[in-house]
């Protein structure tokens, strides 16, 4: 928890126990016509803090112009993750940032704007029940991310389940459940279930 979150919980006399139930990751998507499909963590930091504003600064072959960063919502968990975990608690200061209302609109924006880079949850890469999902989008590319700078094909990973599990993909988020049940009753039983094999298969789906 952040200090402000802890203070808020204490003020409400709500002191939950937290435990992890799943892992998620941020996926970076670009227009299919964009030749740049590799980014390092440093590249992402430089884009967010305004040091890198043009695609040609990342790849001289890239003539797509100014980089436009697109989020699903200005107050979303994606924005918070970038600011807290990628920028070390500092705000995003890139002036070319666009925020839409939902993930499907991020995908549509990237489809229509070759200069854009969209940031979404990787669950949108795998949910085949949703026809707005990236599985069905042939004019979108999912970028590979590298912890090492500069990024190379050998050092970069896409947000696939295996690379999230072994920690090779850089932008991983832990999903926590919070319990405030001193009697350790039904909520704790559910917690143990969701952490078990059957519960984890449900989470995976």
Positions of predicted regions on the chain:
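Exported/periplasmic ABC-transporter solute-binding proteins
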Residues: 2-3, 7-24, 29-205
């Amino acid at each position: 928890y952040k200090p402000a979150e802890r203070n808020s919980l204490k003020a409400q006399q709500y002191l939950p126990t937290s435990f992890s139930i799943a892992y998620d990751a941020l996926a970076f998507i670009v227009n299919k016509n964009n030749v740049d499909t590799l980014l390092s963590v440093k590249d992402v930091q430089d884009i967010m803090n305004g040091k890198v504003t043009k695609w040609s600064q990342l790849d001289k072959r890239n003539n797509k112009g100014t980089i436009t960063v697109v989020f699903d919502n200005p107050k979303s968990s994606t924005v918070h993750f970038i600011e807290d975990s990628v920028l070390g608690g500092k705000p995003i200061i890139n002036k070319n940032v666009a925020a839409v209302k939902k993930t499907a609109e991020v995908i549509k924006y990237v489809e229509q704007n070759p200069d854009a880079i969209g940031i979404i949850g990787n669950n949108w890469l795998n949910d085949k029940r949703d026809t707005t999902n990236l599985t069905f989008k042939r004019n979108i590319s999912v970028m590979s991310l590298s912890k090492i700078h500069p990024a190379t094909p050998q050092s970069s990973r896409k947000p696939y389940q295996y690379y999230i599990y072994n920690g090779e993909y850089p932008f991983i988020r832990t999903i926590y459940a919070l319990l405030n049940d001193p009697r350790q009753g039904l909520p704790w039983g559910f917690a143990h279930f969701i952490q078990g094999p059957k519960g984890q298969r449900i989470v995976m789906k």
